[in-house]
Swiss-Prot record:
Purpose: Component of the proteasome core, a large protease complex with broad specificity involved in protein degradation.
Subcellular location: Cytoplasm
Protein name per the record: Proteasome subunit beta 2
Keywords: Autocatalytic cleavage, Cytoplasm, Hydrolase, Protease, Proteasome, Threonine protease, Zymogen
Short name of any one Pfam family annotated for the protein: Proteasome
Organism: Pyrobaculum aerophilum (strain ATCC 51768 / DSM 7523 / JCM 9630 / CIP 104966 / NBRC 100827 / IM2)
Length: 203
């Protein structure tokens, strides 16, 4: 019989009053073997949208590429950026269409549009849930405990960045398949950008 192998990853998202913060740790693991400590699980789609994911790296990269291509095509045709919800619904349809051979990825979609900031949580089958904060992956239970304690409805982007890092550090310290450092994507009125936070590994 085949041995079950756990694919590790932890990602968090926080909706702030002035934007959205997404973050994920960088370790790529196969079971308890670390393949890399420089995996990218946070992707800027355009200057109003980003995603973070937990799951298999190849599936994350494929979904990010699909979203980038469709966001660009929409902008070229419609002469405006797609809304956060329209891109999330597109991703939902794509993921649900693969329900019999699903993408092994949970996704956080974060964006800002005319309606304000949005954080949308998606499972591998494309279910859509909008929330104020969320955590995905093997370290989600550890990370969400920090988010539960630290989140406020009036939290700012800068405060959300610090809270996201704290949540992921909690996961990295206790989840053996999370680690390597932290990537962040920040989406606010100034656009979307990525940042990196180095974390000392606990071995």
């Amino acid at each position: 019989m085949g041995e079950e192998v756990q694919i590790g990853a932890t990602a968090v998202g926080i909706k702030a009053k002035d934007g959205v913060v997404l973050a994920a740790e960088k370790r790529v693991s196969y079971g308890f073997y670390t393949l890399s400590s420089a995996g990218k699980k946070v992707f800027v789609i355009d200057d109003k949208l980003a995603i973070a994911s937990a799951g298999i790296i190849a599936d994350m990269q494929t979904l990010a590429k699909i979203l980038k291509l469709n966001a660009k095509a929409y902008e070229l045709e419609m002469k405006r950026k797609p809304s956060t919800h329209s891109m999330a619904r597109l991703l939902s349809v794509i993921m649900f269409s693969r329900r019999f051979m699903p993408f092994f990825a949970e996704v956080l979609v974060g964006g800002i549009d005319e309606e304000g900031p949005h954080l949308i949580v998606m499972d591998p089958l494309g279910s859509l849930i909008e929330d104020n904060y969320a955590a995905l992956g093997t370290g989600a239970k550890l990370a969400v405990a920090v988010l539960d304690t630290g989140y406020r409805p009036d939290i700012t982007v800068e405060e959300a960045k610090k809270l996201a890092v704290q949540a992921l550090k909690a996961a990295i310290e206790r989840d053996p398949v999370s680690g390597g450092g932290i990537d962040l994507a920040i989406v606010d009125k100034n656009g979307a950008r990525e940042e990196e936070v180095r974390v000392q590994l606990l071995i």
